[in-house]
Amino acid sequence: MSTAALVEGKIVQCIGAVIDVEFPRESMPKIYDALILDGSELTLEVQQQLGDGVVRTICLGASDGLRRGLTVKNTAKPISVPVGKPTLGRIMDVLGRPIDEAGPIESEVTRSIHQKAPAFDELSPSTELLETGIKVIDLICPFAKGGKVGLFGGAGVGKTVNMMELINNIAKEHGGYSVFAGVGERTREGNDFYHEMKDSNVLDKVALVYGQMNEPPGNRLRVALTGLTMAEHFRDEGLDVLFFVDNIYRFTLAGTEVSALLGRMPSAVGYQPTLAEEMGKLQERITSTKKGSITSVQAVYVPADDLTDPSPATTFGHLDATVVLSRDIASLGIYPAVDPLDSTSRQIDPNVIGEEHYSITRRVQQTLQRYKELRDIIAILGMDELSPEDKLSVARARKIQRFLSQPFHVAEVFTGSPGKYVPLKETIRGFKMIVDGECDHLPEQAFYMVGTIDEAFEKAKKIS
């Protein structure tokens, strides 16, 4: 350690997770320097220089028992975490320390969690599709390899289950490395995820970083950066890596919690005034370069189901595909509860996905949109008042709606139905048959919770 690392300061004020520390005026710590409480492992991160040798810091850990006058040492460098292969198969906290009781992480390489985003000329956009095996996603909002995807939804509509199914389908097929950052979510889900990975023998290819909802705001604010730093290292080694974040909203919320304590004026709806900058700094680093790619899937909680709330609205602009989960669709018992009219993807372009896929997607959306427009008329006057064309549109739309449902592998224990992985070709073939009228003779319940269109035909035989 350098001489600067030995500089000592004293705590002068504690307000929750925000701690003020006084240092000699000639050796004030820099912004983002990590400070360590003498005699403990508690880390503080410098956020502001207040002048007269006083710095304002965020506490990365519980601030219980802290008091004025305690000694703090300056490490003179930002928080660094272990990266590389030794992190695979391990569960770590925000500082990269193992929390799985499996011994220390023997990594010789560490990396600061604060990095600059790659330069513009290093970026490498991709148009290659990533098949997920989930019909509604592959058809309506296909993912790009090396792209960024957001799963938007309110409380209890299935963000985490969708995320787990994507991990199940992509990470297992992918064969490369994955990093999972649990940001302010339930510890039980983190535990379930660990055992799910272990049972399917892919744990040795996954690094897990957790800062769950019982932890202080400093941990939740920085844990996404810790996970991202590990993913960036694999990318810079020339690998294609998957990066999962659950939940990006909690990252924003942690920023809101410390923002007022740092003395910033709240902005719209009480969010921090630096919301767009904080989100931009994180999202701009999640990108693919000429060396390797990061394909990222992020769950985004939508407060009170309001997509115009500043937090989800700020996230939208950074994503290549948005999967919007709808409470109305979930209430019909259709899972995954993806809204096919609200969800979008930049890959929906005939030059990228091909003419056939593009035309089927648009025809499916047109049919569903027509049904949405007719719903009020049906509710008031009934189906009999519709023209024959509209009756046909409604019948097909209801079949499409049910065919967009699918049993998940990760939900087998709850539903009792075996999960289905549907290849993209089968998805396109199935929806083409419905919009072309080849399934008009089948009852709509035959399409509910099946995989391919052939299964719908078999189910129809059993029903009749």
From Swiss-Prot:
PROSITE patterns, A to Z: ATPASE_ALPHA_BETA
The UniProt record lists the keyword Iron-sulfur: no
Enzyme class: translocase
Molecular function via GO: ATP binding; ATP hydrolysis activity; proton-transporting ATP synthase activity, rotational mechanism
Residues at which ATP binds: 153-160
GO CC annotations, alphabetized: plasma membrane; proton-transporting ATP synthase complex
Key words of the record: ATP synthesis, ATP-binding, Cell inner membrane, Cell membrane, CF(1), Hydrogen ion transport, Ion transport, Membrane, Nucleotide-binding, Translocase, Transport
Membrane topology of the entry: Peripheral membrane protein
Subcellular location: Cell inner membrane
Primary localization: membrane
InterPro entries cross-referenced by the UniProt entry: AAA+_ATPase, ATP-synt_VA_C, ATP_synth_F1_bsu, ATPase_a/bsu_AS, ATPase_alpha/beta_chains, ATPase_F1/V1/A1_a/bsu_N, ATPase_F1/V1/A1_a/bsu_N_sf, ATPase_F1/V1/A1_a/bsu_nucl-bd
Reaction catalyzed: ATP + H2O + 4 H(+)(in) = ADP + phosphate + 5 H(+)(out)
Pfam families: ATP-synt_ab (PF00006), ATP-synt_ab_N (PF02874), ATP-synt_VA_C (PF22919)
CDD domains (alphabetical): ATP-synt_F1_beta_C (cd18110), ATP-synt_F1_beta_N (cd18115), F1-ATPase_beta_CD (cd01133)
Paired cysteines (S-S): none
EC number: 7.1.2.2
Family membership: Belongs to the ATPase alpha/beta chains family.
Functional summary from the UniProt entry: Produces ATP from ADP in the presence of a proton gradient across the membrane. The catalytic sites are hosted primarily by the beta subunits.
Assembly mode: F-type ATPases have 2 components, CF(1) - the catalytic core - and CF(0) - the membrane proton channel. CF(1) has five subunits: alpha(3), beta(3), gamma(1), delta(1), epsilon(1). CF(0) has three main subunits: a(1), b(2) and c(9-12). The alpha and beta chains form an alternating ring which encloses part of the gamma chain. CF(1) is attached to CF(0) by a central stalk formed by the gamma and epsilon chains, while a peripheral stalk is formed by the delta and b chains.
Name of the protein in its database record: ATP synthase subunit beta
Protein's organism: Burkholderia ambifaria (strain ATCC BAA-244 / DSM 16087 / CCUG 44356 / LMG 19182 / AMMD)
